[in-house]
């Protein structure tokens, strides 16, 4: 069975962009692939984190993984820092990665822009991501457009290692959704919906209450026209709302356009809010039914399964690089 790896950072509230762009896809994959899904807490540390919030967010994210429909009996669900091989392999990969390669990473340029100081961890983040993927000899990685460049680096580093030390790593392939992989901000639909945005109205969080969901969607930025159509260049706000409606209902976007043809933006927003509230209510009920003890048990078992695979890969890498193994 082909293997899939992906992860989400526990660095803030999980929103519908995370869900529609990645997490929902995870559920569809669990029956056909050997799936490793990770709460990547080490990645979160590349920017300052409140320790109490980080712990809370880690538990919350793991519970949401389960609440959206991931079955711990079918997938390996674990926390990145619980498997130390991630950090160790990241260092080994840094030693064969070139400074220029990391300097060209668009995400580093964006996140470090205008800041007086940034962490080395933010700069070397792509090597930790590469380690996450390569440790499990992953075949496919569900990634958004913003991570595509990092996956290309992962492939380059893996191929370089294989050429230099002998066949070791599987060269992973991206699994990118052609439609809906990038959900945009409700307040600025030219930017991606983000949990790091200072304006909480830019996103609908999975655990938002119905009144908050309704308010955020009704306030979503649109345009001065009145025609409902998909046009990302001229009507990014409406196009974003149509996309969200399509993904939550399973309707083709053309069907959604026809459904609301001749109607006002307010009608689209109102019905979209009702759809989102209805869909998220199921996730929220599942979330409330999961205890912290159950989450910790699942994470412990997942880490044990992940570590069993990771240590074998790390051992192989060390041997090929000439490191002496401890008995």
Curated annotation (Swiss-Prot):
Catalytic activity: tRNA(Trp) + L-tryptophan + ATP = L-tryptophyl-tRNA(Trp) + AMP + diphosphate + H(+)
SS bonds (residue pairs): none
One BP annotation, GO: tryptophanyl-tRNA aminoacylation
GO CC annotations on file: cytosol
EC number annotated for this UniProt entry: 6.1.1.2
Enzyme class: ligase
Alphabetized UniProt keyword annotations: Aminoacyl-tRNA synthetase, ATP-binding, Cytoplasm, Ligase, Nucleotide-binding, Protein biosynthesis
Motif 'HIGH' region boundaries: 10-18
Short motif ('KMSKS' region): ranges: 192-196
Predominant cellular place of this UniProt entry's protein: cytoplasm
Ligand binding (L-tryptophan): 132
PROSITE patterns with a match to the protein in the record: AA_TRNA_LIGASE_I (PS00178)
InterPro entries in alphabetical order: aa-tRNA-synth_I_CS, aa-tRNA-synth_Ic, Rossmann-like_a/b/a_fold, Trp-tRNA-ligase, Trp-tRNA-ligase_bac-type, Trp-tRNA_synthetase
Binding site for ATP: 9-11, 17-18, 144-146, 183, 192-196
Superkingdom of the source species: Bacteria
A Pfam family annotated for this UniProt entry: tRNA-synt_1b
Subcellular location: Cytoplasm
GO molecular function annotation: ATP binding; tryptophan-tRNA ligase activity
Function statement: Catalyzes the attachment of tryptophan to tRNA(Trp).
Family note: Belongs to the class-I aminoacyl-tRNA synthetase family.
Quaternary structure and interacting proteins, as annotated: Homodimer.
Name of the protein in its database record: Tryptophan--tRNA ligase
Record organism: Caldanaerobacter subterraneus subsp. tengcongensis (strain DSM 15242 / JCM 11007 / NBRC 100824 / MB4) (Thermoanaerobacter tengcongensis)
Name of encoding gene: trpS
